[in-house]
């Protein structure tokens, strides 16, 4: 299967000026966010400080490390290592870690810090996080339970997002030689692949399994419009997650899944290449966008370009460049904001979902992170992130 670039859409001519602008915004935010974390989403495009208990607290340090890679300024290294210390303390005391999102917390922050600086505290934090992630393992069904009390039938489920958490487990096997981390990551990924991808190549946000037998039960949404729609960010996690699963396993089924879920996402983009918050909506609908989803997909395309033949890799890089151009030209932060990417959506309430409404048409910290990652991938083709 192949995916063709969009007709008559420009690629990003030069990512460097946009990286410079993003790095300047990160630098300006350091006085507020060196010893505190950013909240998951902004209020009127300004982030509030928080205590670092959120599942999103790894994305701001991840931005700091990318600013360090781009600029070489030691002020970013200093700030990044302070966040590593905080994350090490958090995992040691088990504060806000009883869930599956250890990868989102510790991969862009601590595995990055370890790779860049050799900081042993960062390595220790990430390995402890991998151990914590395995405490969510459910042998009956073969998956990592996302949230809630273990073995409670009301919480006996996994979610599409977790594909992005799995690289932490593969990394832990690489670091320790213990195959259990990677083995369970692969089993979870295969369980997700078998159940979360629908026949039309859209995705279910969450999927329930039977606590007694491990049999698949049903897909439900938490943050999408309804149980049958495709939440834009969930579809984006599937795109990038499939690329990463293919990288780590070389299982050709993941290559097939990547093309299927990517085609679904791209075919439902509005004219400006930035989706509404659920892919059920398109041009003409009066709904908020989710710019973070396009940034995630651009990074997934650039990841998969490393693993396919040259002609197809060029197609994937071109599409990623077109998406990043759309983001940089129309959605990048301007004016009085400490975010990098405008018009993200964390969770929008509908009569049919179960989420708490937060961060609608705001900056979201993972949107900023993946926008920066996409720019850095384009500017430094030999650089690879830490997923």
Model-predicted segments: where are they?
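Glycan-recognition and catalytic cores of secretory/periplasmic carbohydrate-active enzymes
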Residues: 1-387
């Amino acid at each position: 299967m192949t995916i063709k670039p969009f007709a008559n859409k420009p690629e990003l001519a030069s990512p460097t000026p946009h990286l410079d602008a993003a790095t300047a915004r990160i630098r300006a935010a350091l006085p507020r966010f060196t010893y505190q974390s950013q909240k998951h989403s902004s209020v009127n495009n300004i982030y509030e400080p928080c205590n670092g208990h959120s599942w999103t607290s790894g994305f701001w340090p991840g931005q700091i490390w990318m600013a360090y890679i781009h600029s070489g300024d030691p002020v970013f290294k200093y700030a990044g290592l302070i966040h590593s210390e905080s994350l090490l303390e958090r995992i040691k005391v088990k504060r806000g870690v009883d869930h599956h999102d250890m990868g989102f917390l510790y991969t862009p922050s601590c595995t990055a810090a370890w790779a860049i600086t050799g900081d042993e505290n960062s390595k220790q934090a990430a390995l402890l996080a991998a151990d914590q992630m395995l405490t969510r393992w459910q042998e009956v069904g073969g998956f990592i339970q996302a949230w809630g009390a273990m073995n409670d039938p009301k919480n006996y489920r996994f979610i599409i997002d977790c594909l992005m958490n799995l690289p932490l487990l593969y990394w832990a096997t690489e670091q320790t030689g213990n195959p259990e981390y990677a083995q369970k990551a692969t089993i979870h990924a295969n369980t997700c692949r078998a159940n979360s991808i629908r026949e039309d190549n859209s995705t279910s946000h969450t999927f329930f399994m039977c606590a007694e037998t491990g049999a698949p039960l049903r897909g439900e949404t938490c943050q999408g419009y309804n149980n049958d729609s495709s939440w834009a960010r969930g579809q984006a996690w599937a795109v990038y997650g499939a690329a990463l699963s293919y990288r780590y396993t070389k299982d050709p089924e993941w290559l097939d899944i990547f093309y299927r879920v990517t085609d679904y996402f791209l075919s439902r983009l509005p004219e400006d290449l930035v989706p509404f918050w659920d892919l059920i909506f398109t041009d003409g609908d009066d709904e908020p966008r989710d710019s973070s989803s396009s940034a995630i997909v651009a990074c997934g395309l650039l990841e998969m370009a490393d693993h396919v033949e040259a002609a197809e890799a060029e197609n994937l890089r071109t599409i990623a460049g077109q998406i990043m151009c759309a983001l940089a030209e129309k959605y990048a932060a301007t004016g009085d904001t400490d975010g990098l990417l405008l018009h993200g959506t964390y969770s929008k309430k509908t009569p049919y979902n179960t989420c708490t409404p937060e961060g609608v048409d705001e900056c979201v910290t993972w949107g900023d992170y993946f926008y920066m990652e996409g720019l850095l991938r384009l500017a430094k083709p030999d650089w690879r992130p830490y997923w």
